[in-house]
Amino acid sequence: MSGSGAMLLGLLILVAMATSLDTREICWNHSECDDPSEWCCRMGSGHGSCLPVCRP
């Protein structure tokens, strides 16, 4: 494999990793939740929802 081919493969792997991270559930303690003990959860670019327990 040539050097440029290896670089291209590396870029593809980085892009794949970045997109897989983006679809993960993002959780944080959100002040907009009615219950302070609830956590606001967001899937990728979707809207947040307040849940008592959030899966990391």
Swiss-Prot record:
Transmembrane segments: none annotated. Residues 1-23 form the signal peptide. It is found in: Secreted. Keywords: Disulfide bond, Knottin, Neurotoxin, Secreted, Signal, Toxin. It comes from the Eukaryota. Disulfide bonds join 27-41, 33-50, 40-54. One of its GO terms (cellular component) is extracellular region. One of its GO terms (molecular function) is toxin activity. Expressed by the venom duct. The cysteine framework is VI/VII (C-C-CC-C-C). The presence of a 'disulfide through disulfide knot' structurally defines this protein as a knottin. Probable neurotoxin. This is Conotoxin Cal6.41a.
